[in-house]
Amino acid sequence: MLIKKITLVFALFLLVFIITSQKNKSADTKKVRKGFEKLVDIQTLDSSIRVDLKYATTDNFMKKRLYFDIDKAYLQKVIAQRFIKCNTYLKKLHPNYRLLVYDAARPRSIQQAMWDALDSIPVKERTKFVSNPANGSVHNYAAAVDLTICDKYGNVLDMGAGYDDIRLIAYPSKEVYYLKKGLLTKKQIENRKLLRKVMTSQGFINIPTEWWHFNGVTRKQAKVQFAILE
Protein backbone atom coordinates (compact mmCIF):
# COMPACT_ATOMS: atom_id res chain seq x y z
CA MET A 1 0.00 0.00 0.00
CA LEU A 2 2.82 2.37 0.94
CA ILE A 3 4.61 1.64 -2.33
CA LYS A 4 1.44 2.45 -4.30
CA LYS A 5 1.08 5.78 -2.48
CA ILE A 6 4.71 6.68 -3.16
CA THR A 7 4.29 5.71 -6.81
CA LEU A 8 1.14 7.83 -7.09
CA VAL A 9 2.80 10.85 -5.46
CA PHE A 10 5.81 10.51 -7.76
CA ALA A 11 3.54 10.23 -10.80
CA LEU A 12 1.64 13.37 -9.78
CA PHE A 13 4.90 15.24 -9.16
CA LEU A 14 6.20 14.18 -12.57
CA LEU A 15 2.97 15.29 -14.25
CA VAL A 16 3.10 18.72 -12.58
CA PHE A 17 6.77 19.09 -13.57
CA ILE A 18 6.03 18.26 -17.21
CA ILE A 19 3.07 20.66 -17.39
CA THR A 20 5.06 23.47 -15.75
CA SER A 21 8.01 22.90 -18.07
CA GLN A 22 5.75 23.05 -21.12
CA LYS A 23 4.16 26.28 -19.90
CA ASN A 24 7.55 27.88 -19.31
CA LYS A 25 8.75 26.71 -22.70
CA SER A 26 5.62 28.14 -24.31
CA ALA A 27 6.05 31.46 -22.47
CA ASP A 28 9.68 31.73 -23.55
CA THR A 29 8.72 31.02 -27.15
CA LYS A 30 6.09 33.76 -27.14
CA LYS A 31 8.67 36.32 -26.05
CA VAL A 32 10.57 36.00 -29.33
CA ARG A 33 8.92 37.75 -32.26
CA LYS A 34 8.79 35.93 -35.58
CA GLY A 35 11.98 36.59 -37.51
CA PHE A 36 13.94 37.35 -34.34
CA GLU A 37 14.82 33.71 -33.57
CA LYS A 38 18.37 33.91 -34.92
CA LEU A 39 19.09 37.40 -33.63
CA VAL A 40 21.19 38.06 -30.55
CA ASP A 41 20.10 39.89 -27.41
CA ILE A 42 23.16 42.10 -26.98
CA GLN A 43 22.98 42.04 -23.19
CA THR A 44 23.60 38.28 -23.24
CA LEU A 45 27.02 39.09 -24.72
CA ASP A 46 27.79 42.05 -22.46
CA SER A 47 25.57 42.74 -19.47
CA SER A 48 27.23 46.11 -18.84
CA ILE A 49 25.53 47.54 -21.94
CA ARG A 50 22.45 49.54 -20.93
CA VAL A 51 19.16 49.23 -22.84
CA ASP A 52 16.18 51.60 -22.81
CA LEU A 53 14.03 50.78 -25.84
CA LYS A 54 12.21 54.03 -26.49
CA TYR A 55 9.62 52.46 -28.80
CA ALA A 56 8.63 50.02 -26.06
CA THR A 57 7.55 53.11 -24.09
CA THR A 58 5.73 56.37 -24.83
CA ASP A 59 9.01 58.31 -24.55
CA ASN A 60 9.52 58.78 -28.30
CA PHE A 61 8.62 61.23 -31.05
CA MET A 62 5.24 59.53 -31.60
CA LYS A 63 4.39 59.70 -27.87
CA LYS A 64 2.96 56.19 -28.00
CA ARG A 65 4.18 52.64 -27.48
CA LEU A 66 5.06 50.80 -30.68
CA TYR A 67 6.77 47.66 -29.37
CA PHE A 68 4.56 45.22 -27.50
CA ASP A 69 6.49 42.00 -28.14
CA ILE A 70 10.02 43.41 -28.25
CA ASP A 71 11.63 44.16 -24.91
CA LYS A 72 15.29 43.51 -25.68
CA ALA A 73 17.86 45.01 -28.05
CA TYR A 74 18.48 42.48 -30.81
CA LEU A 75 21.10 42.55 -33.56
CA GLN A 76 22.46 40.15 -36.14
CA LYS A 77 25.14 38.02 -34.49
CA VAL A 78 28.02 39.39 -36.57
CA ILE A 79 26.88 42.95 -35.87
CA ALA A 80 26.38 42.26 -32.16
CA GLN A 81 29.89 40.85 -31.84
CA ARG A 82 31.34 44.07 -33.24
CA PHE A 83 29.03 46.17 -31.11
CA ILE A 84 30.18 44.72 -27.79
CA LYS A 85 33.76 45.50 -28.81
CA CYS A 86 32.68 49.14 -29.06
CA ASN A 87 31.46 49.03 -25.47
CA THR A 88 34.71 47.39 -24.36
CA TYR A 89 36.67 50.15 -26.11
CA LEU A 90 34.54 52.84 -24.45
CA LYS A 91 35.18 51.35 -21.01
CA LYS A 92 38.89 51.25 -21.78
CA LEU A 93 38.83 54.97 -22.61
CA HIS A 94 36.43 55.87 -19.77
CA PRO A 95 35.95 53.10 -17.17
CA ASN A 96 32.78 54.72 -15.79
CA TYR A 97 31.03 55.01 -19.16
CA ARG A 98 28.71 52.54 -20.90
CA LEU A 99 26.80 52.42 -24.17
CA LEU A 100 23.05 52.96 -23.76
CA VAL A 101 20.88 51.52 -26.55
CA TYR A 102 17.62 53.22 -27.52
CA ASP A 103 16.74 51.00 -30.50
CA ALA A 104 18.18 48.11 -32.48
CA ALA A 105 16.25 45.55 -34.56
CA ARG A 106 13.02 47.15 -35.77
CA PRO A 107 10.30 45.40 -37.85
CA ARG A 108 9.32 47.08 -41.11
CA SER A 109 5.70 47.29 -39.89
CA ILE A 110 6.92 49.65 -37.16
CA GLN A 111 8.95 51.55 -39.74
CA GLN A 112 5.73 52.07 -41.69
CA ALA A 113 3.98 53.47 -38.61
CA MET A 114 6.83 55.94 -38.08
CA TRP A 115 6.77 56.94 -41.74
CA ASP A 116 3.02 57.53 -41.67
CA ALA A 117 3.28 59.60 -38.47
CA LEU A 118 5.34 62.18 -40.39
CA ASP A 119 2.97 62.38 -43.37
CA SER A 120 2.75 66.17 -43.04
CA ILE A 121 6.39 66.33 -44.22
CA PRO A 122 7.05 65.94 -47.97
CA VAL A 123 8.46 62.53 -48.88
CA LYS A 124 11.82 63.92 -50.02
CA GLU A 125 12.30 65.71 -46.70
CA ARG A 126 10.83 62.88 -44.65
CA THR A 127 13.62 60.50 -45.63
CA LYS A 128 16.02 62.70 -43.66
CA PHE A 129 14.27 61.63 -40.47
CA VAL A 130 12.83 58.17 -41.18
CA SER A 131 13.84 55.67 -43.86
CA ASN A 132 11.11 54.92 -46.37
CA PRO A 133 9.74 51.47 -45.44
CA ALA A 134 9.46 50.70 -49.15
CA ASN A 135 13.27 50.73 -49.27
CA GLY A 136 13.80 49.37 -45.77
CA SER A 137 15.89 50.81 -42.97
CA VAL A 138 19.08 49.09 -41.84
CA HIS A 139 17.21 48.73 -38.52
CA ASN A 140 14.77 46.47 -40.38
CA TYR A 141 17.64 44.06 -41.01
CA ALA A 142 18.79 44.12 -37.36
CA ALA A 143 22.02 45.76 -38.45
CA ALA A 144 21.67 49.29 -37.06
CA VAL A 145 21.58 50.74 -33.57
CA ASP A 146 20.42 54.00 -31.99
CA LEU A 147 22.33 54.85 -28.86
CA THR A 148 24.10 57.28 -26.58
CA ILE A 149 26.63 57.13 -23.75
CA CYS A 150 25.82 57.06 -20.06
CA ASP A 151 27.80 56.73 -16.86
CA LYS A 152 27.64 53.63 -14.66
CA TYR A 153 24.66 55.14 -12.83
CA GLY A 154 22.67 55.59 -16.04
CA ASN A 155 23.14 59.36 -16.39
CA VAL A 156 23.38 60.22 -20.09
CA LEU A 157 26.01 62.50 -21.57
CA ASP A 158 24.78 65.83 -22.92
CA MET A 159 24.66 65.64 -26.72
CA GLY A 160 23.02 69.03 -27.22
CA ALA A 161 19.87 67.49 -28.72
CA GLY A 162 17.71 64.60 -27.57
CA TYR A 163 17.07 61.26 -29.20
CA ASP A 164 14.69 61.49 -32.18
CA ASP A 165 15.11 65.27 -32.33
CA ILE A 166 14.33 66.20 -35.94
CA ARG A 167 15.83 69.68 -35.68
CA LEU A 168 19.01 70.51 -37.59
CA ILE A 169 20.89 70.86 -34.30
CA ALA A 170 20.82 67.04 -34.06
CA TYR A 171 22.71 66.74 -37.36
CA PRO A 172 26.39 65.76 -37.01
CA SER A 173 26.91 67.61 -40.30
CA LYS A 174 25.73 70.89 -38.70
CA GLU A 175 27.85 70.81 -35.53
CA VAL A 176 30.36 73.44 -36.61
CA TYR A 177 27.55 75.80 -37.62
CA TYR A 178 25.73 75.46 -34.30
CA LEU A 179 28.96 75.76 -32.35
CA LYS A 180 29.63 79.11 -34.05
CA LYS A 181 26.06 80.16 -33.27
CA GLY A 182 26.61 79.31 -29.62
CA LEU A 183 23.76 76.78 -29.65
CA LEU A 184 26.07 73.79 -29.18
CA THR A 185 28.96 73.76 -26.72
CA LYS A 186 32.40 72.28 -27.25
CA LYS A 187 31.65 69.71 -24.57
CA GLN A 188 28.44 68.58 -26.28
CA ILE A 189 30.31 68.12 -29.54
CA GLU A 190 33.13 66.30 -27.73
CA ASN A 191 30.54 63.89 -26.34
CA ARG A 192 29.20 63.24 -29.84
CA LYS A 193 32.71 62.76 -31.16
CA LEU A 194 33.44 60.25 -28.41
CA LEU A 195 30.39 58.24 -29.46
CA ARG A 196 31.51 58.36 -33.09
CA LYS A 197 35.08 57.39 -32.16
CA VAL A 198 33.89 54.36 -30.23
CA MET A 199 31.40 53.19 -32.86
CA THR A 200 33.57 53.77 -35.93
CA SER A 201 36.37 51.80 -34.25
CA GLN A 202 34.42 48.70 -35.28
CA GLY A 203 33.27 49.96 -38.66
CA PHE A 204 29.87 51.36 -37.70
CA ILE A 205 28.70 54.21 -39.90
CA ASN A 206 27.10 57.36 -38.50
CA ILE A 207 24.54 59.13 -40.68
CA PRO A 208 24.73 62.92 -41.21
CA THR A 209 21.26 63.70 -39.81
CA GLU A 210 21.21 61.80 -36.49
CA TRP A 211 24.02 61.83 -33.93
CA TRP A 212 22.58 58.65 -32.33
CA HIS A 213 22.21 56.40 -35.41
CA PHE A 214 24.90 53.97 -36.54
CA ASN A 215 24.69 51.36 -39.29
CA GLY A 216 26.69 48.15 -38.95
CA VAL A 217 26.64 47.76 -42.74
CA THR A 218 25.23 49.75 -45.64
CA ARG A 219 21.63 49.21 -46.73
CA LYS A 220 22.87 47.52 -49.90
CA GLN A 221 25.01 45.11 -47.86
CA ALA A 222 22.17 44.45 -45.41
CA LYS A 223 19.83 43.44 -48.24
CA VAL A 224 22.36 40.90 -49.48
CA GLN A 225 23.40 39.48 -46.11
CA PHE A 226 20.22 39.47 -44.02
CA ALA A 227 16.48 38.86 -44.22
CA ILE A 228 14.22 41.84 -43.56
CA LEU A 229 12.11 41.79 -40.41
CA GLU A 230 8.45 42.29 -41.18
For each feature predicted by the language model, list its residue ranges:
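Bacterial Sec-dependent N-terminal signal peptides
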Residues: M1-T29
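Conserved metal-phosphate-binding beta-hairpin within the catalytic cores
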Residues: F214
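Segments that shape or occlude catalytic/ligand-binding pockets
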Residues: P107
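Extracytoplasmic cell-surface/polysaccharide-interacting catalytic and binding patches
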Residues: K23-A104, M114-T209, V217-E230
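Short, well-ordered surface patches within globular domains
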Residues: I110
